């Protein structure tokens, strides 16, 4: 019966949940169909609204999460009413979870489509996606809101090919008294120079990220994706704006569009309204040109799911035969030996909001598309601790995770020869590096490899020092707010 219901068109369009629906238990209003993946702060499920038959996405967020950030995300979505921004329908509290009901985009994110097809987008396809995305950004910026995490993984497509901005977990609101923000937040490779430098930024920070996203859609990954993100953090503000790896492959209009986005000075960078008038965007074709790549991606995903299901069924048969063989005097040990059964899951842990992933895709990839197999994979979506943690930039969370991985990988290994002596770690006076000439190539390579963990450790120490100064101020502000509320 459920399949028939899904094939029928919605009886009427769901615009917002009414008061009667919001007073009921969510299970009375929705049928949860399947888990789609993990987004910022919670798990995302596909569900059907019983009254209208409309498919929706439901983000289930543990109450132990950072409620302030979640409320901010809801607040921003609630204020938005644009066909180019994912719609918000309402929220429920259920046991220890907050259920956030949102618009469902069946084709997934642009980065999902690239990975599923193993193919980047053409210029025509990119222009169409950018046109809708710019309309969404124009709307947000008119509302004085900054998305702060624009990338291919946060641009969702519905099955008709309409692009919508999603995942407002790190979005910010600009007020009249706060012309620029100073918070470092976003994904390293997509971040604007002024965001990294913490010199204050406004809505055009999203335009820089959009330029990086245009390169990502064309080449499969953002600039600097091949290097350590810590180095990228230092290179983005100091190096000239990035360009295509092979500029000769792209038209002058597309190249100029990216150039207009990637202007280092925010004051001279184009706005969303201005870029909508750019020849590359104005000549964009209709959304119908995206339907073929959407259908191709969905077919690939369906075939992979069918293949995985066959493997699961085959494993079940093999295990059943083993059970019959073990029914004699031999008793089967229960424990680690049970690892032959595979879980029938089609979603990775690293999926973004309302984005369906196939479990054969790289896990925890976020949105950065890597064309070669031996490169590192990054993203913004990280699992968060259930306990409350001080806010920190997402790229620092990434560095901490990498540091833990490095420590695990290096456990039991000896320290490289020239690095055993603590004096070798000191910064030479007056930049005198003559002593390096006496080292072997192997020793120099070991020292180079050791620099990144050192840098990350120093950054973490600075962050902790800053947090120790910041937290008492935040506590004092919160205490004053509580006293004002009591009055």
Curated annotation (Swiss-Prot):
Primary location class: cytoplasm
Reactions catalysed: L-seryl-[protein] + ATP = O-phospho-L-seryl-[protein] + ADP + H(+); L-threonyl-[protein] + ATP = O-phospho-L-threonyl-[protein] + ADP + H(+)
SUPFAM superfamilies (alphabetical): Protein kinase-like (PK-like) (SSF56112)
Cofactor: Mg(2+)
Sequence positions that bind ATP: 36-44, 59
Coiled-coil intervals: 290-310
Any one GO MF annotation of this record: protein serine/threonine kinase activity
InterPro entries referenced in this protein's UniProt entry, alphabetically: Kinase-like_dom_sf, Mst1_2_SARAH_domain, p53_tetramer_sf, Prot_kinase_dom, Protein_kinase_ATP_BS, SARAH_dom, STE20/SPS1-PAK
Acidic residues: bias regions: 313-326
Similarity comment: family membership: Belongs to the protein kinase superfamily. STE Ser/Thr protein kinase family. STE20 subfamily.
Protein name: Serine/threonine-protein kinase 4
Lineage: Eukaryota, Metazoa, Chordata, Craniata, Vertebrata
